[in-house]
Amino acid sequence: MHSIVCFTSDFGTNDGWVGICHAVIYRSCPGVRVVDLAHDIPPFDIRKAAAVAAAGVWQLPDAIHLVVADPGVGGGRRDLVLVTSGGSILVGPDNGVLLPATWRGGGISRAYAIDATRIGFHAPLATFHARDVLAPAVALLASGVDVVAFGDPVDPSTLVEAPFLPGHREVDSMAAEVIDIDRFGSIRIAVSADDVAANGLDRGRLEVVFGHARIELPFGRTYSDVDEGDPVALIDSSGWLTVAVHLGSACERYAVEPGALVRVRALA
């Protein structure tokens, strides 16, 4: 059994949707603890939801992760249960929102498309799959039901692509995307802590190029490794390479938005 469910969505907290999903889970599995990771994700923002879910798996790998940012709900896309090599379980729509979290969990080991009839739902599905399919599936998983009971296996190569791709090596640099901007204006880049170490980016100074902006800055352990107003590169609490400004906004200073292409290289 899994004792913790991490719940990420773009539902907000004013309309009762989060509470309804909680109630569905508790009704079938009263012993589970549901942790609300984030529900103030901008509506339909699959990229942001994917980033938050990936951080959740990195910090709580042994939990079940329910992730819902689903602009295509009711439109025929699949509902999924994914199991990572590290043992994390992810439940959500097949729109790419789950994939970055699987990278943080060591990759996909098993994937299943949820058959709503196998979890007891027989009415026509419409606009609230989180209540009608995903939350009931999470409750069954938390109760110890094996993932094979939910539907047919899925070839991971057929899943909808992630909203951003992991960084990759290009000659003497790492090329990646800006994942998102945190509320302090720090710029998260799709380069994991492991990739930073493997590519020698955790020593000395770095060059970071955001297309229009070229920055030289130190790689540090924390924001206060530099003076107030100075930039620093570090691994943030979500486990991503991040460009920050001590007591300032890197996003405002460098005019960078999510999705921007980045190149990072170590300076001699």
Language model regions located:
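Surface-exposed interaction regions enriched in Ser/Thr/Asp/Glu
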Residues: 260-266
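Anionic-ligand-binding alpha/beta catalytic cores of soluble enzymes and soluble regulatory domains
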Residues: 121-202
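Active-site histidine-anchored catalytic micro-motif
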Residues: 28-33, 48, 59-69, 74-132
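Fold-independent oxyanion-binding glycine-rich loops
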Residues: 9-11, 37-39, 68-71, 84-85, ...
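Structural motif
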Residues: 3-6, 32-35, 63-66, 79-81, ...
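N-terminal glycine-/serine-/threonine-rich phosphate-binding loop
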Residues: 1-76
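A conserved acidic, glycine/proline-rich C-terminal tail/linker
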Residues: 190-255
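Conserved active-site and cofactor/substrate-binding residues in soluble primary-metabolism enzymes
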Residues: 16, 20, 29, 44, ...
